[in-house]
A protein has these predicted regions:
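Membrane-interface motif at the C-terminal end of an N-terminal transmembrane signal
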Residues: 16-33
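N-terminal cap/lid segment of alpha/beta-hydrolase-fold proteins
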Residues: 28-84
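Solvent-exposed loop/turn segments at secondary-structure junctions
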Residues: 78, 93-97, 115, 120-125, ...
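Short beta-strand element of the alpha/beta-hydrolase
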Residues: 82-93
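Short amphipathic alpha-helix adjacent to the substrate-entry channel of hydrolases
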Residues: 99-118
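Active-site signature of alpha/beta-hydrolase-fold catalytic machinery across serine-
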Residues: 103, 170-174
Length: 180
């Protein structure tokens, strides 16, 4: 009888932990309101922590294998204007897909950047970051794309979180578009 009770308690505990992990996996990694809740110590930080002046849109495309999709957040006026926009490629951390960083991507795009990410669960080689940039560069040369001649290829940056930090170094030193 005691063994049965211990078994039930163990089963319930496992189910509660599983439910908690499922709930946590559904939350964004960067809270949607982070630009309003983070406190800074200076005027410059306060200025750039706020959202920029651009409305933001998002485009997606299918990516190979585990990468699932490429995502680009961009200033909405990109679709109608003649300007080009600097690019930020973001390499996500282990098991934290780019879709968990939407608030960060929207924030950067509101300041006039094209921000790229993908769903790669293991970014360390930099290959998925490079492929995501290659996708945008292909779109930049495609007259049928919203990104046609919109990416400022002289101003491309890369950033990463956790394992994505390693991906940054590998993307710029080991991947085909590292020299950009």
């Amino acid at each position: 009888k005691i063994l049965k009770i211990v078994g039930i308690i163990l089963l319930v505990s496992i189910m509660l932990i599983a439910a908690l992990l499922i709930c946590l996996s559904m939350k964004p990694f960067v809270p949607n309101n982070y630009t309003k809740t983070v406190e800074t110590g200076g005027e410059l930080e306060t200025k750039y922590l706020a959202m920029g002046t651009h409305e933001v849109k998002c485009a997606q495309a299918e990516a190979p294998g585990d990468w699932k999709k490429f995502e680009a957040f961009y200033p909405a006026d990109l679709e109608t204007g003649e300007d080009t926009y600097p690019v930020v490629v973001f390499a996500n951390g282990t098991g934290v897909a780019a879709s968990k960083y939407k608030a960060l991507f929207r924030h950067l795009a509101s300041w006039g950047f094209i921000v790229l990410g993908n769903e790669d669960p293991s970014t360390c080689t930099g290959a998925s970051a490079d492929a995501t940039l290659a996708w945008l560069l292909e779109c930049n040369g495609d007259p049928d794309s919203v990104f046609y001649q919109k990416a400022d290829t002289e101003h491309i940056g890369i950033s990463g979180h956790s394992q994505g930090g390693v991906a940054v170094f590998n993307a710029v030193s080991e991947q085909p578009h590292g020299g950009l």
